[in-house]
A protein has these predicted regions:
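Active-site neighborhoods of metal-dependent hydrolases
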Residues: 1-10, 16-46, 51-62, 74-203
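Conserved divalent-metal-coordinating catalytic cores
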Residues: 70
Length: 203
């Protein structure tokens, strides 16, 4: 439980690094992680990697690279700029694959700025790879398990509710106004940006 509430200690980071070194020795192709605010467990509990410090990420990437091989892949949140990933690629001497570089209607230039930063990093001799989608990101969801909006700060009170309690919150005008306001504000990374014309009720 502590892993979803705080950063790892140096001792815990070393234990994780040992597991990664063992995996690389056994033939793993690399190490993957996420800082995406959309990645939560049950009840909105953040995935442990979302709480990891930059130092933890770097230590684990360097553990991966101990044999001179491996690719680090990260689904990055807004707090992990390309410049930081370039630094990690340089210090570990290994490629970094960055996902998911998706267009954001409230901040349309952000994904292109990331792609430009990746190109510039490669021109400086780093190996950064940006993952893009060849088709629109689509999914089915329900209001009981609303993955596209789980990363919204305004939606957090709903994540631990079920049944009548959830229905009451969803009907609360103040809750709805907070969600609308957050969706209207620009964001570096967000799965859903209030593009209601793209949402279809199927059941």
């Amino acid at each position: 439980d502590a892993a979803t509430q705080r950063e790892a200690t140096p001792e815990e980071i070393e234990r994780m690094a040992a597991v990664i070194r063992e995996a690389m020795d056994a033939g793993a192709v690399g190490f993957a992680s996420s800082t995406s605010p959309a990645h939560n467990g049950e009840g909105g509990i953040p995935m442990p990697s979302r709480l990891a410090s930059d130092e933890e990420h770097l230590a684990l990437i360097q553990a991966m690279a101990h044999r001179g091989s491996g690719v680090y892949m990260v689904t990055k949140g807004g707090q992990m700029p390309v410049a930081l990933l370039e630094e990690m690629a340089a210090r570990a001497g290994r490629p970094v694959m960055i996902a998911a570089l998706l267009h954001n209607g409230t901040n349309p230039g952000a994904v292109f700025a990331d792609l430009d930063a990746i190109s510039a990093a490669n021109a400086r001799g780093r190996k950064l790879i940006g993952q893009v989608s060849c088709c629109p990101l689509t999914m089915e969801f329900t209001l009981a398990s609303p993955y596209p909006v789980e990363g919204l700060a305004s939606w957090q009170p709903a994540l631990s509710l079920k049944g009548a309690a959830l229905e009451a919150l969803l009907a609360d005008p103040q809750f709805r106004d907070r969600v609308r306001a957050e969706l209207a504000a620009p964001a570096t990374f967000r799965l859903f940006n209030g593009e209601w014309d793209k949402v279809h009720v199927v059941q």
